[in-house]
Regions:
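Carbohydrate-associated surface elements
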Residues: 52, 72
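A conserved mid-protein helix/loop that constitutes part of the nucleotide-sugar donor-binding site
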Residues: 98-121, 134-137
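Aromatic "clamp/platform" in nucleotide-sugar-dependent glycosyltransferases that forms part
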Residues: 156, 175
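Short hydrophobic beta-strand element within catalytic cores of glycosyltransferases
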Residues: 192-195, 205
Length: 264
């Protein structure tokens, strides 16, 4: 395949590294090196969506010619609510108290156990879990066992912009990201995001200014949600408008591909 396409450029948007505890990250790293890295090393160039990922592939896995081309988001589709819109959307979704959205597929690195334990600490807050995946059944059973009446599993949704505008914060206690589109969508929607201080998330969020970066421990996550202010979301929106629109992302990608073409 690579002999047939000697100038092949690969785009990498998977997690690359997952920060599992108890040495789990090193097992993941070994698997990635065995299964993914050989193909990356044979490509003409590799594009990835965060500066951290580009540095990591080069430094840890010895991949050459890696270029960071950060993601963009549609800031017209994902926007803060207009006056009165949030209240109307809360009525549509039956939200009568503060609500937190968790937009993440049900896979191990998304750390839904921390979500459920955080919800247990905040019984006065509704948690809306959007996404499907191999662990959906497990987390449904866990929520029932924990008696979490404030947790809803919404599955796959086509109304994400409206859901963002209906809630008050977003929680993503992730253990592995490259560059999270859900984080960018939430920020563009003017929401405070509470997430973990893994490298790719720290590229998007400045703790205490455009969101919160806290360890994935339920008491810390719950406290950050209690303290989340609208100002975080306003500054997050301004950051995305300045650096991560679709137009900006397209221009970055076009410029990188043009440079690679000219270099031969």
């Amino acid at each position: 395949f690579f002999a047939r396409y000697p100038r092949l450029v690969l785009l990498v948007h998977d997690q690359i590294e997952v920060f599992y505890p108890l040495g789990g990250r090193y097992l993941y790293r070994l698997g990635y090196r065995l299964l993914q890295v050989p193909n990356l090393r044979r490509a003409r160039a590799v594009l990835t969506v965060s500066r951290w990922a580009a540095r990591w592939l080069e430094r840890v896995h010895g991949v050459k010619g890696v270029h960071a081309v950060p993601n963009g988001v549609d800031v017209e589709r994902f926007r803060p609510p207009l006056p009165g819109e949030k209240e109307a959307l809360k009525g549509r979704y039956g939200l009568k108290r503060p609500a937190v959205l968790v937009p993440a597929r049900m896979s191990p690195e998304k750390n839904h156990l921390a979500v459920l334990l955080t919800a247990r600490l905040l019984p006065q807050v509704d948690f809306l879990l959007v996404g499907t995946g191999e662990l959906l059944g497990l987390w449904r059973r866990a929520a029932r066992l924990l008696g979490l009446e404030n947790v809803r599993f919404l599955g796959r949704r086509e109304d994400m912009p409206e859901l963002y505008r209906a809630v008050d914060a977003v929680l993503l206690p992730t253990l592995g990201e490259n560059q999270s589109l859900a984080t960018l969508e939430a920020m563009a929607s003017g929401l405070p995001v509470v997430t973990t201080p893994i490298p790719a998330q720290a590229e998007l969020i400045q703790d205490g200014l455009t969101g919160r970066l806290v360890p994935p421990w339920p008491p810390r996550l719950a406290q950050a949600l209690r303290e989340a202010s609208p100002g975080l979301g306003k500054r997050a929106r301004a950051f995305v408008e300045a650096t991560h629109t679709l137009d900006q992302a397209a221009r970055r990608l076009a410029a990188t591909l043009k440079r690679l073409w000219e270099e031969g």
